[in-house]
């Protein structure tokens, strides 16, 4: 208990006191994520919050972990955190092409699967499949990790959204690890909670700083590790969820996962690249209905809480029934949102005129040329 509490407190304190310093440095050096026609923010805001999240998380884990019982796989976890963070930070500052980001994510995933042994080895009866061969396990694990990394990256388009969803997901995973005395992963999960709680103080609308790709991809990576360890832990399965752990983990991450799967499916159906930017994400749909940043974040946070609660409520049902309920409720709500919820107010995009007397030109600093950005990152 002391170890877990220390993890939360240290991560919170380090992140909380680093953020004002990062905001000041960003302001002094004009390191901003500039608004454009697709982004939902209207003011210059730094996207370097991932630096504080990464520092608070990693230092917390290193300081409170018992190195006498330190899992060998954790050296690869720390290396993976560092690589995904640096990759995201480079993208936040200089912008990376999509293929370079995907290549980096594949490198991280290969390290976790081949070296750390982070594998889904059993589907617990999903589609009639139980044990997976090594090759099948590699494919399923790669898909899961890459999907979760990008799902958090792609929902990070509204102040407080990715942080609040990541917080509740890690809190749920951490609680069950703690209840089953899996302290290593409980510490990891609760350290994320501590860092995100501090970050949300500065990220809730109106945001003073964004987590950027360096933060959102790191949170996605953390959730992928926790989800796979949750699915693979025999104590959690036998004590709480029978054969339903994949559906439970899915329910804890349902909003980001189904959002990215739905949007990718829509793009493929329209014969577009899955990575082509659009405004079909849930936060875009809600904003198009006239909701503010805060209202969008609170709505989706409560939706994730509802799905987690529903999943736990029906945890003793068959795996397929739980998944069917999750999909049915989610897509029913999306349909109702699109077809029956009225628009509260019209959105008007003000575009600059060509005349010199028009709206004053927005400065574009060399380090952040928003118009030239080509990446998977969507707002």
Predicted regions and their residues:
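Alpha-helical transmembrane segments
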Residues: 1-25, 29-30, 54-82, 162-289, ...
